[in-house]
């Protein structure tokens, strides 16, 4: 193969090809990973968070700029008209031009207040980054929930359609038996009643699919009607196991959880704000340099031209501003206490959420295993009722009841698998690990639709 064809495609190119294929072919089935990649590009909530992050991190260069040299230029061109009277003496009306040009340079030499404001801005920028990371993690959860909701709705519709087909077949058989004089009218009416309920459920299932697909399309900005499907043969419990120890996850969530990191940055910003308030009344020292030129400064020096150069150090010492400094310190201290309490609350909530999601995965896997056995048993009951019907021991209604129980168990099994997958990605999101690799793992539990 020529070398040019072995060149690895960049990620944007691969994503563009994915979108083109998804748009061009109505038979294209979008998997969970592809849905997440599209959502990363198109989700409005994430894009708004990105813009908010870009704006938030500008606080640091803005604060740092106040510690750099500031250079300014001012210039004026004036036309002065002076009418002067000294007692009874009237002086002639004077008209003369006045010009002024000044170039000033100022460099802070000692300003602990500005240094504290810079540290506060750095913490604010970190909180913006934590917020953006949190939105990325939440997007993975939202896409997973939306995608699996579509699959579950389609699974429910397929089971209902299967029940409808079976009920219609049983209804035809019951009608033939009644016509032949060996059936009873009650069986026909009961089957029809069950069929009406199933038809209503089918309509509701179709509406649920449309709503779920609309929710997913809002995230991906891509209308797709073909999806992967839930398949018991593809569901791999071993890939979802989180280990037997909860403690490592609780420790990890304190270090990596986006909400905890955001609150830590906010606490650090509040501490820096307190430092800034404490140093606001400290002396400041600036180096100054100035070059100026003036002409026509007043009526006595109409034709004068003055040039001056100034170089020196300026000391500013705030003395009293009506209690401003004390109030600022009290306010900053209260804000620090608030941020510390919010940090501790975020840590407790993150650990609590991680514990819930962790046990949801473990309990979900156990429930899936139990429902798999229940589904196999329910199918055996259906087969046994069918054999008993042929032997004349069971009725058509018995078969329908067994099939309904089997369908309900199958639906419960599908719901258990979906809940287990969602709980798993929530655990990953809580420790900032809900990325493309995690979504790829989830996609391996699904099967392309035929």
Describe the role of every protein-language-model region.
Residues 3, 30, 138-252, 357-360, ...:
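Periplasmic alpha-helical coiled-coil/stalk elements that build and connect Gram-negative outer-membrane
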Residues 6, 81, 412-450:
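Acidic, low-complexity, intrinsically disordered peripheral segments
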Residues 14-24:
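Bacterial N-terminal signal peptides
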Residues 25-29:
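Sec/Tat signal peptide C-region and signal peptidase I cleavage site
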Residues 37-47, 54-69, 102-120, 130-137, ...:
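A glycine-/polar-enriched beta->alpha junction
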Residues 39-40, 188, 222-290, 437-450:
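Amphipathic alpha-helical coiled-coil scaffold segments and their short linker/junction regions
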Residues 48-63, 135, 139-158, 169, ...:
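Amphipathic alpha-helical coiled-coil segments
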Residues 74-107, 231-242, 275, 288-328, ...:
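Small/polar, glycine/serine/threonine/aspartate-rich low-complexity segments that form flexible
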């Amino acid at each position: 193969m020529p070398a040019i064809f072995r060149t690895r495609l960049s990620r944007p190119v691969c994503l563009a090809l994915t979108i083109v294929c998804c748009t061009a072919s109505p038979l294209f089935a979008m998997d969970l990973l592809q849905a997440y990649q599209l959502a990363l590009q198109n989700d409005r909530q994430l894009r708004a968070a990105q813009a908010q992050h870009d704006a938030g991190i500008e606080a640091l260069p803005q604060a740092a700029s106040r510690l750099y040299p500031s250079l300014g230029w001012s210039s004026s061109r004036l036309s002065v008209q002076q009418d002067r009277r000294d007692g009874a003496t009237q002086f002639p009306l004077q008209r003369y031009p006045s010009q002024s040009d000044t170039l000033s340079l100022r460099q802070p030499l000692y300003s602990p207040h500005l240094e504290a404001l810079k540290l506060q801005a750095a913490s604010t920028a970190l909180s913006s980054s934590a917020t953006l990371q949190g939105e990325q993690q939440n997007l993975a959860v939202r896409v997973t929930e939306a995608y699996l909701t579509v699959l579950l709705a389609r699974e429910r519709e397929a089971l209902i359609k299967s029940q409808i087909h079976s009920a219609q077949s049983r209804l035809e058989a019951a009608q033939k038996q009644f016509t032949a004089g060996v059936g009873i009218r009650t069986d026909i009416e009961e089957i029809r009643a069950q069929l009406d309920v199933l038809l209503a459920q089918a309509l509701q299932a179709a509406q649920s699919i449309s709503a779920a697909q609309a929710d997913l399309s809002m995230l991906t900005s891509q209308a797709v009607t073909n999806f992967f499907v839930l398949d018991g043969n593809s569901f791999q419990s071993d890939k979802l196991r989180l280990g037997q120890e909860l403690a490592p996850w609780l420790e990890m969530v304190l270090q990596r959880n986006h909400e905890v990191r955001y609150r830590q940055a906010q606490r650090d910003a509040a501490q820096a704000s307190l430092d800034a308030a404490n140093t606001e009344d400290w002396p400041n020292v600036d180096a100054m340099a100035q070059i100026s030129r003036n002409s026509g400064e007043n009526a006595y020096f109409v034709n004068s031209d003055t040039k001056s150069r100034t170089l020196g150090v300026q000391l500013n010492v705030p003395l009293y501003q009506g209690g401003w400094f004390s109030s600022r310190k009290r306010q900053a201290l209260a804000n620090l206490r608030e941020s510390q309490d919010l940090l501790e609350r975020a840590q407790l909530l993150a650990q609590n959420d991680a514990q819930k999601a962790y046990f949801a995965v473990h309990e979900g896997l156990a429930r899936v295993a139990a429902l798999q056995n229940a589904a196999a048993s329910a199918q055996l009951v259906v087969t046994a009722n069918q054999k008993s019907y042929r032997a004349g021991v069971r009725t058509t209604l018995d078969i329908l009841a067994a099939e309904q129980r089997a369908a309900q168990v199958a639906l419960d099994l599908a719901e258990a698998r979906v809940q287990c997958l969602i709980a798993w990605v929530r655990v990953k999101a809580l420790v900032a690990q809900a990325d493309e690799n995690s979504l790829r793992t989830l996609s391996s539990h699904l099967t392309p639709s035929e």
